[in-house]
Swiss-Prot record:
The active site is at K162 (charge relay system), E252 (proton acceptor), C286 (nucleophile), E464 (charge relay system). This is Betaine aldehyde dehydrogenase. Gene3D superfamilies: Aldehyde Dehydrogenase, Chain A, domain 1 (3.40.605.10), Aldehyde Dehydrogenase, Chain A, domain 2 (3.40.309.10). Binds 2 potassium ions per subunit.
Length: 490
């Protein structure tokens, strides 16, 4: 029997039954427990949500900027009041350690909403003089109804990253969470309504990307789609959104990011950064620095420091405050990660540690994979070229700066990159050469609300967070005023 009651769709300010009777299960990856049955939206439900969103958006956009800002700030307060409840639910649904969800996921999501709530009154047009008798003014107007499609690794945070700028700009949003982790997004919908967001301005449709996601991207009255997920799926979403009605898109896609350790680096700091860039959230972070480049002369020493730190990882029940490494998000994903590990072994990478499923005690019922480190990796190996999205680090040796920059950029992806060095000139010189949208120097992973994030190449289109993201949820209307006489050529 499921722990929670049947989860319905959230449309027009409240929970409603789906148009069909199909459901799917939310599974706790730490022990296989069925958390809830969730209704699967039908095509009719997408239309119902669009109609509700169109109605609510007109009310929302007609409010003053200060009114909208005040309501969103109230939602921030409720998020923070319910932080522990939401974190506990996120941990059950994703398997992420409670030490992450309680102190990072909900907190930083609320920070993003607070950031955009503060920017609402700053949405402005321009006045452009043409001559004494004429000028142009511009208006930044909301797009209307927009859609967000989330990934499974940061469910409520991604929902906030997408909905915060959308709602701040006066839009209504239809959000489809990942089928694997849907529960906290439904709670976010409750919070928006409680805060005073008009009915229909934030709707949640649960179900598969293949069906519900496609119906959303194809809908002619949805003006924009913001998607987070894998590159292959992102290409399909972008093609569907474009071919159906030339929708605007934001794509935050996959990565295979390089972390370059230079020969002057503090190796202890470099090892700490590499650990965070590979094993935080059990390796299920799109920006992970999974290709760790280390000078050949320092590789053995660096490997020893990594092994020392791997021993400090505390894997176990993610509801335990002392744990910092939980299961993967699902048993299906666990098998995918184990498949990549097997390929690493087959293709000649040297296994330093891990390489198997964790077993015994609490691990037997969960989707746990041991923190895994390969070394002596080469650029053509599958584990080096493809996104694994799990706790698998690949260490690669190099000899020169020119060589490592070339190899770091030799990828279809361009989401993130980082370097560790004491040389300030080298730091800026090299970071400017790396083909990636999110870069860190002597750090890894922090992504503040003010920081635009997004990828180069096949890692994405557009940006999330920062002031620029707010503009992407508006369109510009130009208006010319003529105060003088008008001369016709006819």
């Amino acid at each position: 029997m499921a722990r929670f009651e049947l989860q319905k769709l959230y449309i027009d300010g409240g929970y409603v039954d789906a148009s069909n009777t199909e459901t799917f299960d939310a599974i706790n990856p730490a022990n296989g427990e069925v958390l809830a049955q969730i209704q699967r939206a039908g095509k009719e439900d997408v239309e119902r949500a669009v109609v509700a969103a169109e109605k609510g958006q007109k009310i929302w956009a007609a409010m003053t900027a200060v009114e909208r800002s005040r309501i969103l700030r109230r939602a921030v307060d409720i998020l923070r009041e319910r932080n522990d409840e939401l974190a506990a639910l996120e941990t059950l649904d994703t398997g992420k350690a409670i030490s992450e969800t309680r102190y990072v996921d909900i907190v930083t999501g609320a920070d993003v909403l607070e950031y955009y709530a503060g920017l609402v009154p700053a949405i402005e047009g321009e006045q452009i003089p043409l001559r004494d008798s004429s000028f142009v003014y511009t208006r930044r107007e909301p797009l209307g109804v927009v859609a967000g499609i989330g990934a499974w690794n940061y469910p409520i945070q991604i929902a906030l990253w997408k909905s915060a700028p959308a709602l701040a700009a006066g839009n209504a949003m239809i959000f489809k969470p990942s089928e694997v982790t849907s529960l906290t997004t439904l709670k976010l919908a409750e919070i928006y309504t409680e805060a005073g967001v008009p009915n229909g301005v934030f709707n949640v449709l649960t179900g598969s990307g293949r069906e519900v996601g496609t119906w959303i991207t194809e809908h002619p009255r949805i003006e924009k789609v913001s998607f987070t997920g894998g590159t292959d799926t992102g290409k399909k979403v972008m093609a569907s959104a474009s071919s159906s009605s030339l929708k605007e898109v934001t794509m935050e896609l996959g990565g295979k990011s390089p972390l370059i350790v230079f020969d002057d680096a503090d190796l202890d700091r470099a090892a700490d950064i590499a650990m965070m860039a590979n094993f935080y959230s059990s390796g299920q972070v799109c920006t992970n620095g999974t290709r760790v480049f280390v000078p050949n002369a320092l590789k053995a020493e660096f490997e020893a420091k990594i092994l020392e730190r791997v021993k400090r990882i505390r894997a176990g029940n993610p509801e335990d405050e002392n744990i910092n490494f939980g299961p993967l998000v699902s048993f299906e994903h666990m098998e995918s990660v184990l498949g990549y590990i097997a390929k690493g072994k087959e293709q000649g990478a040297r296994l330093l540690c891990g390489g198997d499923r964790l077993t015994g005690g609490v691990f037997d019922k969960g989707a746990f994979v041991a923190p895994t480190v390969f070394t002596d990796c080469t650029d053509e190996m599958t584990i080096v070229r493809e996104e694994i999205f799990g706790p698998v680090m690949s260490i690669l040796g190099y000899d020169t700066e020119e060589e490592v920059v070339r190899r770091a950029n030799d990828t279809d992806f361009g989401l993130a990159a980082g370097i560790v060095t004491r040389d300030l000139n080298r730091a800026h010189r090299v970071i400017h050469l790396l083909e990636a949208g999110i870069c860190w120097i002597n750090a890894w992973g922090e992504s503040a609300a003010q920081m635009p994030v997004g990828g180069y190449k096949q890692s994405g289109v557009g940006r999330e967070n920062g002031i620029s993201s707010l503009a992407q949820y508006t369109r510009i209307k130009s208006v010319q005023i003529e105060l003088g006489d008008y001369a016709s050529v006819f």
